[in-house]
C-alpha cells in the first residue's frame, strides 16, 4: 500500500511540473502585452486626432503592446510628452497652429516628422452664405456676430482671436469643443441659418456639408500645414520597435477622412480604426518595416 501511495505522489508531482513548465505556452494576451511593454498616447479630442490616435493604438496593440490613450488640452499634451508622461502624440499641427508650444517645450520633444501632409485651418461657413472673405465680416452682422470655436488654448482659437483683432471684427468667439462646434454647424445648416465656425481639414464635416473657407488676405491662419508625430526624448532607446512604427506612420487626408466619417456616422472610434487597419493592410505593413 505504501509503495502505491509513493507512486501516486510521484505521478502528481510530475503532472504539476509539466503543468508549470507548459504555462508560457498558455500565456494570456494581457501577460504578453505586459512583457512587450505599455505605451501611452496623448491626444486632443479633435476628430482628426481621435482618428489617428486610435489607428496607431490598434497597430501597436496588434504587435502585442498594452496601449493607453489620454485626452488632454493642447497645452498639457505638449507638456506631457516633454516631461515623459506620454510616449507619443500624433497631434502636432506645425509650423503655425502649435508653433508656440514647440517654442516652449521643444527641448523635450523628438519630432518624428509629418504623419499627414496638407492641412489647413481658418474660418468656415456654409457655402450658401454670401461672403467670401474674413474682411466681409466687418461689413455686416453675420451669424449673430458670433464665431463658434472649440476648446480654449487650441492654436486655432489663438489665431481666431488674432483675426478678430487684426480685421477689426466686433464678433464674439465662443469656446466649446470639436463636438459642440460640429453640433452647432449641423443645427444651423439644418435650418438654413448662418453660422461661422473655426474649421480645419481634414475633417469629416467637409464630406457631410457644403462648406467653404473664408479667404484670409492678412494670412493670420498661415499657409498649409502638416500634422507631426512627436515622441518623448528617450523613446527610441527604450522602445525601438514602437519608435520605428511611429516614425513610419503616415497616411493621407482621404485615409483619415474615412475613419472620421465612420465615427461621425455612429461607429465607435476604435472599431472604425480597426476596420480601416483591416482594409488597408498594405499601408499598415509599410509602417512595420
Which positions does each model-derived feature cover?
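A bilobed periplasmic-binding-protein/Venus flytrap-type ligand-binding module shared by bacterial periplasmic
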Residues: 120-130, 225-239
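Pocket-flanking alpha-helical
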Residues: 53, 73-107, 183-184, 204-210
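A conserved helix-loop-strand patch within extracytoplasmic ligand-binding domains
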Residues: 106-153
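Short, well-ordered beta-strand elements
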Residues: 32-48, 65-70, 144-148, 246
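Short helix-initiation/N-cap motifs at beta->coil->alpha
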Residues: 44-47, 68-80, 173-184
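Bacterial lipoprotein signal-peptidase II cleavage site
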Residues: 19-31
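Short beta-strand->loop
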Residues: 108-116, 194-203, 207-222
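Ligand-binding cleft/hinge of the Venus flytrap
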Residues: 55-63, 141-173, 278
Amino acid at each position: 500500500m505504501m509503495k502505491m501511495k509513493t507512486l501516486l505522489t510521484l505521478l502528481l508531482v510530475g503532472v504539476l511540473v509539466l503543468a508549470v513548465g507548459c504555462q508560457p505556452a498558455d500565456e494570456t494576451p494581457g501577460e504578453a502585452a505586459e512583457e512587450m511593454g505599455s505605451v501611452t498616447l496623448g491626444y486632443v479630442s479633435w476628430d482628426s486626432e481621435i482618428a489617428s490616435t486610435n489607428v496607431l493604438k490598434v497597430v501597436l496593440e496588434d504587435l502585442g503592446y498594452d496601449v493607453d490613450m489620454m485626452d488632454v488640452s493642447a497645452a498639457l499634451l505638449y507638456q506631457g510628452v516633454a516631461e515623459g508622461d506620454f510616449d507619443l502624440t500624433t497631434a502636432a499641427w506645425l509650423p503655425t497652429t502649435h508653433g508656440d508650444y514647440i517654442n516652449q517645450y521643444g527641448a523635450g520633444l523628438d519630432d518624428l516628422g509629418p504623419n499627414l501632409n496638407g492641412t489647413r485651418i481658418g474660418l468656415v461657413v456654409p457655402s450658401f452664405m454670401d461672403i467670401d472673405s474674413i474682411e466681409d465680416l466687418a461689413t455686416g452682422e453675420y451669424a449673430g456676430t458670433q464665431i463658434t470655436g472649440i476648446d480654449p488654448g487650441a492654436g486655432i482659437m489663438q489665431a481666431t482671436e488674432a483675426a478678430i483683432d487684426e480685421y477689426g471684427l466686433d464678433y464674439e468667439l465662443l469656446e466649446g469643443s470639436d463636438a459642440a462646434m460640429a453640433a452647432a454647424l449641423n443645427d444651423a445648416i439644418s435650418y438654413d441659418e448662418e453660422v461661422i465656425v473655426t474649421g480645419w481639414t481634414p475633417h469629416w464635416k467637409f464630406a457631410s456639408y457644403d462648406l467653404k473657407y473664408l479667404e484670409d488676405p492678412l494670412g493670420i491662419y498661415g499657409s498649409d500645414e502638416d500634422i507631426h508625430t512627436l515622441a518623448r526624448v528617450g523613446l527610441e532607446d527604450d522602445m525601438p520597435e514602437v519608435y520605428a512604427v511611429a516614425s513610419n506612420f503616415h497616411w493621407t487626408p482621404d485615409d483619415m477622412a474615412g475613419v472620421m466619417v465612420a465615427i461621425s456616422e455612429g461607429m465607435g472610434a476604435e472599431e472604425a480604426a480597426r476596420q480601416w487597419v483591416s482594409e488597408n493592410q498594405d499601408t499598415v505593413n509599410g509602417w512595420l518595416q
